[in-house]
């Protein structure tokens, strides 16, 4: 989507975390000692506007699990503080595909973060990745809630995107009610937005590196290497 100069599809975004951390200040003694909800809410109301104030693009696709629910979750906070309608693009990929991709990555890149945690084997690493407060669990929670709010969501199946990317991208433009931009689907660029790129030294080399030649799903042999107990527990999560 970033080939279109009018659109920015962000890297993994911190905006939802900003809003949640501001909300959690309400649990601190210093706030409860002088509970000025209105003033703090004023800041929460403009998190997105301030964060993206200097971005030149017309449309920002903010990548984060906005539909996660809780007490409150991201979805509840957004409904209160964003103050305008918003749409969600939801990517669906079978969980075993996701875990196999992680296995391939951390096996081929010794500095990958699961290898830094004194975890003994693949089963321990995958269980760590699937912990309740981890990124995968948050995304699954968001997807579950997305199906309850399908009127505001557009669902993109990973297999469809990698089989006919142009068709799926056109559907996204229709959902956004924006004119189609002629994208190229070969000779792809690594993600770079407003001059910034991922620093994968933080999480492990190549975590966000894409294959540049073309968009195509390739068989991942690590599917056969996923431990049996992981398959038994999570293998039913398919889209």
Regions found by a protein language model. Give the residues of each.
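Short, structurally constrained coil/turn elements
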Residues: 3, 54-55, 82, 149
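PAPS-dependent sulfotransferase catalytic core
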Residues: 1-48, 54, 191-196, 205
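Broad structural signal for hydrophobic residues in well-ordered alpha-helices, predominantly aliphatic
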Residues: 1, 51, 78-79, 172, ...
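Glycine-rich phosphate-binding loop used to anchor ATP phosphates in small-molecule kinases
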Residues: 48-74
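A generic structural motif
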Residues: 5-8, 59, 82-86
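CE4/NodB-like, metal-dependent polysaccharide N-deacetylase domain
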Residues: 46-56, 139-147
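PAPS-dependent sulfotransferase catalytic domain
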Residues: 65-183, 197, 201-203
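PAPS-dependent sulfotransferases, especially Golgi type II membrane carbohydrate sulfotransferases
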Residues: 106, 147-148, 166, 174-239
